[in-house]
């Protein structure tokens, strides 16, 4: 111990302290150096990982684990391999760390993608350059919203293009013989699913041959909005990045219809991924198994809902005297299946709770590509359609033909609750469209050389180019003319069903068929209760047995035949009385419904049963049959004497109220030919006035009735229907056409215009002079009282305030220009005296019926005596009518005179101040005592 102590005496203590400090310093230095090395290694690893992520480099420690997406991206090892400042050991450790990170990344991606591959091992890219023909836009018009491209613009892109949902390109599909091509897109909130099955075929198959042999062309878009699950869906999007296995919009998938592959589909039934919050769908399995597509030239609808009454009972058409039952109708009551191996049917199997969930990772994928996919086996195609999540299994088999359309295929995708989905974009045909056919895509058609005389001769058949109409396919495609944003609008899942009512008489065959096909092809089948064709006693032979036979292929189409000519109004009433749908949708028989036309109409009626929804009526040119769009900001109006017309909303009003193209427009008067109305509300209003004859004025009557009795009329810009506008009506009238229309208008005026009916008569004075027999109005006036309808003045102030509707043409004191004196009443005579605007006996009105009246008394001439007297007012008494400010056409020099019109010689009102009396004398344009003016004048 003493020996040790001596080392710490004197200088020894210093040496010991230095030694200990050196050891401690060395330890800290070594630790710092180790930390520095570790930090450098970590930084290098991170930089290498980032660099390799950018260049697509993947280290492949095991060639058996090579993933397809990295084969073409193989790179040499890192530069400086085997070298470095830390020696071989540090380099080896660094490389092992990098390899471990890369292996983990590859393993994670492989697991994620193999999970989506339904256990089939090999993963095949889902997009591939395709040879699909895109729909063209109207000539000389380039669409910029992505809904259409020029015919020459074929899709040969190498990568799918991201677009918005509304910009999904319209694509025609090609399939091998015996293959049904189905394109179904499902949107749920912010996520989407595209299903487009195609039959597999060899790479050497001829595309043109496939186009000629395809059987079915179906385009269906479906989207549902699930607000409660939106946040969970977003979280899952972040947790599961989009995989290349998700198909893009516009892609078509091929499904082989073999027994082995059908078993493969069923074998994977239990593999549905339930990690994402999907809505649950339920459907009647027995009903679904029975439904199929009837192989007909162009399409069919379900018979189940075709002709049932409100209590689910089949409607016996023979019970109505308005209906003639054909043999085809009786046969449809008990359809029999006929064996036909060529007939294909498509129907979904039962949707299990976990299998009925449709979703994809991003809404933009819904319409991101117009490419056809590579040929894929059934199992991988099924994976592609679901993105690894199995929805309802699609079973494709060969069955006997049926007359039922698979409406539940769409309906099953909609939740049964009161949620919402995006408007369905449906365009269904059972035979392929020829893109080179005349008039295809709404293009104009030119009469072939040498056929001009025939076309001119046939013009009279329909007062439009019937020759060209017969050349155009009855199911031609037309451009989607809806404003941008309509495709994303939400509608409720539980919309009411509708009965579409078309009345016709001697309609052109091709035009009538095109109208029916446009409804069938572009309407959600679960919303169409029936299509009622009301034949108003047509005389054309082709509209009898031939029409019955043709329409027998569509179970939801019913033909009601009137036994005598009743006219459009009563024909529509017959259709309404036989309709079984919740909503009545009236259409003309020369229309073409555009995509997405029906749901926006039914949505407005669903929101309020007192709303009457009208589509935007676009133009089908009567000369070249081209489909032309119209201004989005138009509304129906009328001018006196109740002449219907269209008026564009002024730009300053649009800017001030920030009206968008997709906003509904309040419509004072509807055109009357195309609209949807709740059936029960229609009958509550008393339907059309049954006293109206044939055609004309019914749109005015129903418009006034709806607005004044608590309803609303709206134009829905997202619903578009083309209509052939003709310069003349080709249909015959039992009586004189003009008198029939005028009689109807007089009947409407007498019931609904109140005191403003004088304004109506003032613009058509001959109407009151003719003394038209308008029939008994008691029932209609009692109906107005029962409904507690508002006045026509309320209508003008609240619905149509921009209509000029002064009750009188002029009012106030009536001044003699030369004398400066005013007409006044003294006792029972008419005199001149000093003007006094506050004196009631000097206040005169010049009415629209050309009476000069003060209260109930009117100024009347006594031509024989040249005097003037007072007479009780009578609108029909021609001896009380004067012309003032309205003689400019015939006698412009007498424009400031007051002229008695009912006399062979023109007599004018003249003042005589000396005697304070009035008289009538021969008109003299330069005589100042015959010039008069009212205090105020009004225009209408």
UniProtKB/Swiss-Prot annotation:
Name of the top EC class for this enzyme: transferase
Q: Annotated region Catalytic subdomain A: where?
A: 495-604
Residues modified as Phosphoserine: 292
Residues annotated as binding Mn(2+): 588, 590, 723
Result of mutating residue 507 to D? In a breast cancer sample; somatic mutation
Question: For binding substrate, which residues are annotated in this chain's numbering?
Answer: 536, 565, 589, 695, 726, 731
Q: What's the superkingdom here?
A: Eukaryota
UniProt cross-references to InterPro entries, sorted A to Z: GalNAc-T (IPR045885), Glyco_trans_2-like (IPR001173), Nucleotide-diphossugar_trans (IPR029044), Ricin_B-like_lectins (IPR035992), Ricin_B_lectin (IPR000772)
Q: Report keywords, A-Z.
A: Disulfide bond, Glycoprotein, Glycosyltransferase, Golgi apparatus, Lectin, Manganese, Membrane, Metal-binding, Phosphoprotein, Signal-anchor, Transferase, Transmembrane, Transmembrane helix
The UniProt function text for this chain reads: Catalyzes the initial reaction in O-linked oligosaccharide biosynthesis, the transfer of an N-acetyl-D-galactosamine residue to a serine or threonine residue on the protein receptor. Has activity toward EA2 peptide substrate, but has a weak activity toward Muc2 or Muc1b substrates.
Q: Which family does it belong to?
A: Belongs to the glycosyltransferase 2 family. GalNAc-T subfamily.
Kindly state the subunit structure of this protein.
Answer: Interacts with EXT2. Does not interact with EXT1, EXTL1 or EXTL3.
Protein name as annotated: Polypeptide N-acetylgalactosaminyltransferase 5
- Gene symbol? GALNT5
């Amino acid at each position: 111990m003493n020996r040790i102590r001596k080392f710490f005496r004197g200088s020894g203590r210093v040496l010991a302290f230095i030694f200990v400090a050196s050891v401690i310093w060395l330890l800290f230095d070594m630790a710092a150096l180790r930390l520095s090395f570790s930090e450098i290694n970590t930084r290098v690893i991170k930089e290498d990982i980032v660099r390799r992520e950018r260049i697509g480099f993947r280290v492949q420690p095991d060639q058996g684990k090579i993933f397809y997406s990295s084969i073409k991206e193989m790179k040499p090892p890192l530069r400086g391999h085997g070298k470095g400042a830390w020696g071989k050991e540090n380099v080896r450790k660094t490389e092992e760390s990098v390899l471990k990170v890369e292996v983990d990344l590859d393993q994670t991606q492989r697991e994620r993608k193999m999970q989506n591959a339904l256990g089939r091992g090999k993963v095949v890219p889902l997009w591939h350059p395709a040879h699909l023909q895109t729909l063209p836009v109207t000539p000389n018009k380039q669409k910029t919203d992505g809904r259409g491209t020029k015919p020459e613009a074929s899709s040969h892109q190498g990568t799918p293009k991201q677009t918005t949902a509304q910009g999904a390109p319209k694509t025609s599909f090609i399939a091998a013989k015996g293959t049904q091509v189905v394109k179904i897109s499902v949107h749920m909130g912010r996520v989407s699913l595209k299903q487009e099955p195609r039959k597999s075929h060899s790479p050497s198959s001829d595309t043109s041959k496939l186009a000629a042999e395809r059987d079915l062309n179906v385009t269906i878009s479906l989207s549902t909005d699930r607000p409660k699950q939106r946040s969970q869906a977003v979280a899952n999007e972040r947790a599961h990045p989009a995989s290349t296995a998700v198909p893009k919009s516009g892609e078509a998938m091929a499904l082989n219809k073999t027994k082995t592959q059908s078993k493969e589909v069923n074998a994977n039934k239990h593999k549905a991924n339930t990690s994402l919050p999907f809505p649950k769908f339920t459907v009647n399995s027995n009903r679904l198994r029975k439904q199929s597509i009837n192989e007909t030239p162009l399409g069919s609808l379900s018979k189940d809902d075709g002709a049932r009454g409100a209590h689910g009972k089949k409607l016996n058409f023979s019970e109505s005297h308005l209906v003639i039952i054909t043999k085809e109708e009786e046969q449809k009551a008990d359809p029999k299946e006929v064996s036909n191996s060529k007939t294909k049917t498509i129907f979904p199997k039962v949707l299990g709770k976990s299998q009925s969930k449709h979703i994809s990772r991003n809404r933009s994928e819904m319409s991101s590509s117009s490419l056809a996919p590579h040929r894929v086996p059934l199992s991988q195609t099924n994976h592609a359609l679901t993105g690894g999540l199995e929805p309802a299994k699609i079973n494709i088999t060969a069955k006997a033909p049926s007359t039922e359309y698979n409406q539940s295929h769409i309906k099953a995708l909609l939740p049964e609750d009161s949620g919402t989905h995006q408007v369905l974009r449906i365009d269904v045909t059972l035979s392929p469209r020829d893109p080179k056919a005349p008039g295809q895509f709404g293009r104009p058609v030119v009469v072939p050389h040498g056929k001009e005389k025939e076309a001119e001769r046939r013009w009279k058949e329909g007062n439009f180019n019937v020759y060209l109409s017969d050349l155009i396919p009855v199911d031609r495609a037309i451009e989607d003319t809806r404003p941008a944003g309509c495709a994303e609008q939400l509608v409720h899942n539980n919309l009411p069903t509708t009965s579409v009512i078309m009345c016709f008489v001697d309609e052109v065959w091709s035009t009538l068929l095109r109208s029916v096909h446009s409804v069938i092809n572009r309407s959600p089948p679960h919303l169409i209760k029936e299509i009622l064709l009301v034949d108003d006693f047509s005389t054309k032979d082709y509209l009898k047995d031939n029409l019955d036979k043709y329409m027998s292929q569509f179970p939801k189409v019913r033909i009601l035949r009137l036994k005598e000519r009743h006219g459009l109004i009563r024909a529509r009433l017959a259709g309404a009385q036989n309709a079984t749908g919740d909503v009545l949708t009236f259409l003309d028989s020369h229309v073409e419904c555009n995509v997405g036309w029906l749901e926006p109409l039914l949505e407005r009626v669903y929101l309020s049963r007192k709303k009457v929804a009208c589509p935007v009526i676009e133009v089908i040119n009567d000369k070249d049959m081209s489909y032309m769009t119209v201004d989005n900001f138009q509304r129906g109006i009328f001018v006196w004497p109740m002449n219907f017309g269209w008026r564009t909303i002024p730009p300053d009003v649009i800017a001030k109220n920030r009206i968008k193209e997709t906003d509904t427009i309040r419509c004072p008067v509807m055109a009357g030919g195309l609209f949807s109305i709740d059936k029960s509300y229609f009958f509550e209003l008393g339907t059309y006035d049954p006293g109206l004859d044939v055609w004309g004025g019914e749109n005015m009557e129903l418009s006034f009735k709806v607005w004044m009795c608590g309803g609303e009329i709206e134009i829905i810009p997202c619903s578009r229907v083309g209509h052939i506008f003709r310069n003349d009506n080709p249909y015959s009238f039992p009586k004189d056409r003009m008198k029939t229309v005028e009689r109807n208008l007089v009947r409407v005026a007498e019931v609904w215009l109140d005191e403003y009916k004088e304004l109506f008569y003032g613009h058509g004075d001959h109407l009151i002079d003719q003394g038209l027999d308008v029939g008994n109005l008691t029932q209609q006036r009692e109906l107005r009282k029962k409904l507690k309808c508002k006045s026509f003045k309320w209508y003008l102030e609240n619905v149509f305030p921009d209509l000029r509707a002064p009750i009188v043409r002029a009012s106030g004191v009536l001044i003699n220009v030369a004398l400066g004196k005013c007409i006044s009443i003294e006792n029972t005579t008419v005199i001149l005296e000093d003007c006094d605007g506050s004196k009631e006996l000097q206040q005169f009105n010049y009415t629209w019926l050309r009476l000069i009246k003060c209260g109930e008394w009117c100024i009347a001439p006594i031509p024989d005596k040249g005097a003037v007297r007072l007479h009780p007012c009578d609108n029909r008494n021609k001896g009380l009518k004067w012309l003032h400010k309205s003689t400019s056409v015939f006698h412009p020099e007498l424009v400031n005179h007051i002229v008695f019109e009912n006399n062979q010689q023109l007599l004018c009102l003249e003042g005589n101040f000396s005697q304070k009396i009035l008289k009538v004398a021969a008109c003299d344009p330069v005589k100042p005592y015959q010039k008069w003016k009212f205090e105020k004048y009004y225009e209408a």
